[in-house]
A protein has these predicted regions:
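The Walker A/P-loop phosphate-binding site
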Residues: 2-99
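Cytosolic-facing regulatory segments adjacent to core modules
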Residues: 32-36, 70-154
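Helical hairpin unit composed of two closely spaced alpha helices linked by a short loop
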Residues: 156-163
């Protein structure tokens, strides 16, 4: 069992290092105006809180995409309110393309851009979808372990929206 209780003497060497070197910033979020105040470190937790329909999910998608593009992060995503896995991937494609994924009468991604985007999304995002069944936090992280084992990768970040 791993240790979850510490005394200062248990971490005196790392305290000394921290004292000398200071706190290191995490990965760049892709937002210049945000980076002065916020960065993301692997293993840390971020909670995005606001009222209904304020863009929390979209902001989370933007953060995930930027961390994938600029730092190579791989993600496990559970976001049942966004829709089916197809609909979640479509949202991620829209974020990656920075223009509409769906074909419409206005500006839209080309087939070539879409193929490149699908390849990128496929390499960096794994959607966990329990259908109409409940999914516990433990069940989510069991699925993350399964993703890592079956794909021989490490998931760098998880998005659970909402839980």
């Amino acid at each position: 069992m791993r240790n979850i209780i510490y005394k200062a003497e248990d971490v005196v060497d790392s305290l000394s290092t921290l004292r000398k070197e200071g706190v290191k910033k995490g990965a760049w979020t892709g937002f210049d105006s945000l980076f002065d105040k916020y960065s993301v470190k692997k293993g840390s937790t971020t909670y995005i809180y606001a009222g209904a329909h304020q863009g929390k999910s979209q902001f989370g998608f933007e953060l995930m995409m930027n961390l994938s593009e600029y730092s190579g992060w791989k993600w496990a995503v559970y976001t049942p309110e966004t829709g089916s896995p197809t609909e979640v991937f479509a949202e991620l494609l829209w974020v990656y393309l920075r223009k509409p994924f769906l074909i419409n009468d206005h500006l839209t991604a080309t087939d070539e851009e879409t193929e490149k985007a699908i390849s990128f999304i496929n390499d960096h995002f794994y959607i966990i979808d329990s259908g109409l069944q409940d999914l516990s936090v433990e069940g989510f992280y069991t699925a993350v372990d399964q993703i890592e084992a079956e794909n021989f990768i490490t998931i760098d970040g998880c998005m659970i929206d909402p839980f």
